[in-house]
Curated annotation (Swiss-Prot):
Binds 2 magnesium or manganese ions per subunit. It comes from the Bacteria. GO terms for biological process: protein modification process; SOS response; translation. Mg(2+) 1 binds at residues 248, 260. It comes from Pectobacterium carotovorum subsp. carotovorum (strain PC1). Its cofactor is Mg(2+); Mn(2+). Mn(2+) 1 binds at residues 248, 260. This is Probable alpha-L-glutamate ligase. Mn(2+) 2 binds at residues 260, 262. GO terms for molecular function: ATP binding; metal ion binding; ribosomal S6-glutamic acid ligase activity. Belongs to the RimK family. It holds the Pfam family RimK. InterPro entries: ATP-grasp, ATP-grasp_RimK-type, ATP_grasp_subdomain_1, RimK, Rimk_N, Rp_bS6_RimK/Lys_biosynth_LsyX. ATP binds at residues 141, 178-179, 187, 211-213.
């Protein structure tokens, strides 16, 4: 197969591993910067051009699109879909997952347990917003944040009001969530491919920090997840229409709570911790689904 990886930086661990895994299975791979693509959008002969040349058709495309370029990156991904490439995650699902509010609303609608969450733009009554989610301590997030950026733990009501007022000054959308104290700065990252949780790790925030993101100095260990945690990770992935996702879960006294569903999960932490070939599993999933698609197309053409 010919596989395109959409990424701004082919030197990143995840991109390198996906390329290695695909080439080990005798596929040709090209890493393409989506911001260097431009598109011809028409009904007769749509195309994608890249750095002065028209790109050939790819059998599959793997989106590794950073949150900062979601709009243009998913437009490029959508163009590849128009041309018949199989997407590891399709553009609609990626956009859905990147919209934190929309994704939480979809998960809640499907009965998936979440931390109590409030959403606001410029609340006139900060006190009511804080009370709505159970009071302090609570976590205040910028909707556009990633990897723990724009996330603040407010230990007291006064601190929460100050943080919310500061974020309001940025003219930003704000998520306010209950702080799950019993999680003790830990969460579980479940890596879902298709209908399976193929790996899971427990992430622990570093001393003095409440965010467990590995990019912020957190540590990771192997963990055995429960059947309930496995089921909720798969359901959350399917609810957003994703084939592959990193689902972050908090262990609360009332049961597992989904914090976030990541459409482009990093592979370094989970591969190095578990020793599993996650990249290889992703390529195998693509193989199975492109073969199924080609078989279906052949059957339709014969009929």
């Amino acid at each position: 197969m010919k596989i395109a990886i959409l990424s701004r930086d082919g030197a990143l661990y995840s991109c390198k591993r996906l390329r290695e895994a695909a080439e080990a299975r005798k596929h040709s791979v090209e890493i393409i910067d989506p911001l260097s693509c431009y598109m011809n959008i028409n009904s007769a002969a749509p195309s994608v051009h890249y750095r002065g040349r028209r790109l050939d058709k790819y059998d599959a495309v793997i989106p590794r699109i950073g949150s900062q370029i979601t709009f243009y990156g998913t437009a490029v991904l959508r163009q590849f879909e128009m041309l018949g490439s199989y997407p590891l995650n399709n553009s609609v699902a990626v956009i859905r997952a990147r919209d934190k509010l929309h994704s939480l609303q979809l998960l809640a609608r499907e009965g998936i347990d979440l931390p109590i969450t409030g959403f606001a733009h410029s609340p006139d009554d900060t006190g009511d917003l804080i009370a709505m989610v159970g009071g302090a301590p609570l976590v205040v997030k910028l909707v556009e944040g990633t990897q723990g950026i724009g996330v603040v733990l407010a230990e007291t009501r006064q601190a929460a009001e100050s943080v919310i007022d500061a974020f309001r000054g940025l003219n930003a959308h704000i998520l306010v969530q209950e702080y799950v104290r019993e999680a003790q700065g830990k969460d579980i990252r479940c890596l879902v491919i298709g209908n399976r949780v193929v790996a899971a790790i427990e992430r622990q925030a570093k001393a003095g920090e409440f965010r467990s993101n590995l990019h912020r100095g957190g540590s990771a260990n192997n963990v055995k997840i429960t059947a309930q945690e496995r089921a909720i990770a798969i359901k959350a992935t399917k609810t957003l229409g994703l084939n592959v996702a990193g689902v972050d879960i908090l262990r609360a006294d009332r049961g597992p709570l989904v914090m976030e569903v990541n459409a482009s999960p990093g592979l370094e932490g989970i591969e190095t911790t578990t020793g599993f070939d996650i990249a290889g599993m992703m390529i195998e999933f693509i193989e199975q689904n492109t073969q199924r698609r080609f078989a279906t197309s052949a059957s339709i053409s014969k009929s």
